[in-house]
A protein has these predicted regions:
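Active-site-proximal loop/helix segments of hydrolase catalytic cores
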Residues: 141-208
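Pre-active-site segment of Zn-dependent metallo-hydrolases
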Residues: 10, 31-74, 86-90, 167-180
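Zn-dependent metallo-beta-lactamase
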Residues: 1-46, 50-53, 231-238, 242, ...
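Binuclear metal-ion centers of metallo-dependent hydrolases, dominated by the metallo-beta-lactamase
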Residues: 113-128, 176-179, 203-256
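Metallo-beta-lactamase
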Residues: 70-81, 214
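Short internal beta-strands
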Residues: 97-104, 213-218
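Active-site metal-binding loops of divalent metal-dependent hydrolases
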Residues: 39-43, 78, 140-141, 165-167, ...
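Beta-strand-turn-beta hairpins that frame and shape the catalytic cleft
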Residues: 11-16, 29-36, 127-136, 155-161, ...
Length: 256
């Protein structure tokens, strides 16, 4: 078993844990021990899907889909690094696991003949009760690449985590992002490709929303995806020096 899987499984109860799996993938473990996985990319299917080396995985996998049974899974849109078609059948193999997926993920659900009774298709404005987690799905502007993509505000153990999802900068949606209250954590991409926020955009969003902690993601795994964490640091220091941020390495966890 991978050491990272062991760290997830043995993370003590009584605390809220946030783990980084790489790319846009995160795991939240509640105080009672329930687990929520978000946009996990655990395979090498990207290079096969896209047909060129620009989507070759450049960092090793730290988790196999068979190693951890998740209570809940979120797939914000059907791109391979958010809905991993190779891994999802394994992730959903336990009859206890539930999936919350954007409506355009259904094609892959049908292809894999997953159990529809354990799947909820979500749109912006939907709220779902998932055990210890309250999930508020929000608008996500990923353009024509994924018109039904969603972001999500996760409420757990008195904490509020906003995952912006794959989106461009939409400051006009500030009220939506803060509709449930102030944010403890904001997670957003910095790669600046395929319609996503770049380093400056992420810093600007952090400045406007003023979360307690900003965590950039969506960089470092593919040669074609871009994203410079060093540049993000420089911009944060200039644009919003009072905002705390954290660059998480794959396998790292924090207590919220």
């Amino acid at each position: 078993m991978n050491p990272f899987a062991i760290s997830v499984l043995t993370a003590p109860k009584g605390m809220t844990h946030l783990f980084y799996v790489g790319q846009a993938g995160f795991i939240v473990k509640s105080k009672s021990g329930q687990t929520l996985a978000l946009d996990l990319y655990l395979s090498d299917c990207g290079e096969r899907f896209e047909g060129h080396i620009g989507f070759k995985r450049l960092l090793p996998r730290i988790l196999s889909p068979q190693e951890v049974i998740f209570d809940y899974i979120i797939a914000t849109h059907p791109h391979f690094d958010h809905y991993d078609v190779d891994s999802m059948p394994f992730l959903m193999s336990n009859p206890h696991t539930r999936l919350y997926a954007s409506v355009d993920c259904k094609q892959f659900v049908d292809q894999a003949a997953l159990d529809e009774k354990r799947i909820t298709y979500v749109k912006p404005g939907n709220t779902c009760h998932a055990g210890d987690f309250l999930l508020h799905f929000i608008n996500c502007d990923h353009g024509t690449l994924a018109p039904d993509a969603v972001g999500v505000i996760i409420e757990v153990d008195g904490k509020r985590i906003m995952v912006a999802g794959d989106t461009c900068l939409r400051l006009d949606r500030k009220d939506e992002y803060l509709s449930k209250g102030s944010l403890d954590v904001m997670i957003a991409p910095i790669n600046g490709a395929y319609g996503n926020l770049n380093e400056d955009d992420c810093a600007e969003l952090s400045k406007v929303l003023s979360p307690e902690l900003t965590i950039p993601c969506h960089y470092g795994l593919f040669a074609t995806h871009g994203g410079l964490p060093g540049l993000f640091m420089e911009i944060m220091r200039e644009k919003c020096p009072d905002n705390d941020y954290l660059l998480m390495t794959m396998g790292e966890s924090i207590i919220l």
